[in-house]
Curated annotation (Swiss-Prot):
Organism: Treponema pallidum (strain Nichols)
CDD domains reported in the protein's UniProt record: Ribosomal_S12 (cd03368)
Protein name in UniProt: Small ribosomal subunit protein uS12
Signal peptide start-end: none
PANTHER family documented for this protein: 30S RIBOSOMAL PROTEIN S12 FAMILY MEMBER (PTHR11652)
An example Gene Ontology CC term for this record: small ribosomal subunit
């Protein structure tokens, strides 16, 4: 416990919280190029083939990003936009690719939650 005199001389040290998405460098999104598109299996107790891409960002950092939605058109050298947000059952995947931006197409035939998947409004 510091004395009043010590506090007036030095003051308290601020506690800084570490960011959960350091590769974004405090930006909301970052542009990148896909270097590899692959499927990975989740942690126990889940079972699936989750679609992920290895992305080299404009800052030069290489990260693994999740491709949300059913079906995608991504391949090597595709330009993508990534945002923060981890995938709980995929260790090391801390970023999401934004559907409907750059080379990434929106999800086809998506009726609900369209804004999250870059799908246009279906005209009846």
């Amino acid at each position: 416990m510091p004395t009043i005199n010590q506090l007036t001389r030095i003051g308290r040290k601020a506690v800084f919280s570490r960011t959960k998405s350091p590769a974004l460098q405090a930006c909301p999104q970052k542009r990148g190029v896909c270097t590899r598109v692959m499927t990975v299996t989740p942690k126990k107790p889940n079972s699936a083939l989750r679609k992920v891409a290895r992305v080299r960002l404009s800052s030069g950092v290489e990260v693994t990003a999740y491709i949300p939605g059913i079906g995608h058109n991504l391949q090597e050298h595709s330009i993508v936009l990534i945002r923060g947000g981890r995938v709980k059952d995929l260790p090391g995947v801390r970023y999401h690719i934004i559907r409907g931006a750059k080379d990434t197409l929106g999800v086809v035939d998506r009726k609900r939650g369209r804004s999250k998947y870059g799908a246009k409004r279906p005209r009846a």
